[in-house]
From Swiss-Prot:
Belongs to the glycosyltransferase 4 family. MraY subfamily. It is a multi-pass membrane protein. Pathway: Cell wall biogenesis; peptidoglycan biosynthesis. Pfam families: Glycos_transf_4, MraY_sig1. Keywords: Cell cycle, Cell division, Cell inner membrane, Cell membrane, Cell shape, Cell wall biogenesis/degradation, Magnesium, Membrane, Metal-binding, Peptidoglycan synthesis, Transferase, Transmembrane, Transmembrane helix. This is Phospho-N-acetylmuramoyl-pentapeptide-transferase. Its cofactor is Mg(2+). The keyword Ribosomal protein does not apply. It comes from Rippkaea orientalis (strain PCC 8801 / RF-1). Its EC number is 2.7.8.13. GO terms for biological process: cell division; cell wall organization; peptidoglycan biosynthetic process; regulation of cell shape.
Amino acid sequence: MDAKIPPLTPFKKPSGTSLLILLILLLGLLCLGFAQILDLSSISLSLLFPLAVSAICSAILGYVVVPVLRRLKAGQVIQEDGPQTHLKKAGTPTMGGIFFVPVAVIIALIWSKLDPAVLAVSIVTLAYMGIGWIDDWQILRQKSNKGLTPRMKLILQIAIAVGFCIWTFLTQSADLTNIALPGQIILPLGLFFWIIAGFVLVAESNATNLTDGVDGLAGGTGSLAFLGLAALMASNNPGLMIFCACMSGGCLGFIVHNRNPATVFMGDTGSLALGGSLGAIGILSGHVWGLFLVSGIFFVESLSVIAQVSYYKATKGPDGKGKRLLKMAPLHHHLELSGWAETQIVGLFYLINAGLAVLAVISS
């Protein structure tokens, strides 16, 4: 009998609580590190206070909302063709985005004294949350994994993106269309910028949605991404800095309930809101390059799906079947089927995203 070779994984399997502690430490270290990188001694407290308040409020509210979702039987429907280990998660409450996203938005609006930029981004965030809620509700009603049709969801996402781009075009400086790249390179895009802006909003919301497939993954990486953007806002946009810090804290508070084994999932209600929010902030602040870096995990997850589908279609034979690059897309499912534990994947992605946040601040 052949000996079984254990799967190659980067480190021992951590617990969900260990990952929560890791996330808290990473966020704290990033706050301190950003103060040194940007030479702004006050930035640490400016980031930590709204982050902590939002995290605590979201975590506390979760203890009220999660039992309500459970009583309403708002349980997640698990895809049968997904990883078999996920079948045991069937029935776990979903739509968790309804408690941590509004909390973060409300705290940000109050803290920033209804800053116009924060108000605009808040509207986009809640609008994308609304799309996600409709999708989640349809799934729960039909007791299947099919909510809004992909076409209808895309139409709604594009409509919000167009509305936001029109508002930004009418209210912001024309200099916004010049994208700053590393090495003091300025890329003047003119009207083409708005096509990219619309694409970024839609793509970012879908990318975070794809990443939300493992306990603690989308919320934790989202928290780190928002904190990276917050640091980029520190010198010239305190309102958006506060908003990003609050969203980072909201995600952290959600992880209290979503860490492995999760007692609630954010659903499309949360994941679409996170992506739409990140995209809107990156566009409105002019930090498109920084957005690309802090969203590196989301980008790779999306790219893995695109590559999987494209390769399958390109290699399709007479029998209608093609070949697959990955065992399953997105990438986190491929790693699961390769023998990685969920918590190993999440821990590694947290560390990578923290590094990307630092890189974004250094290179912007």
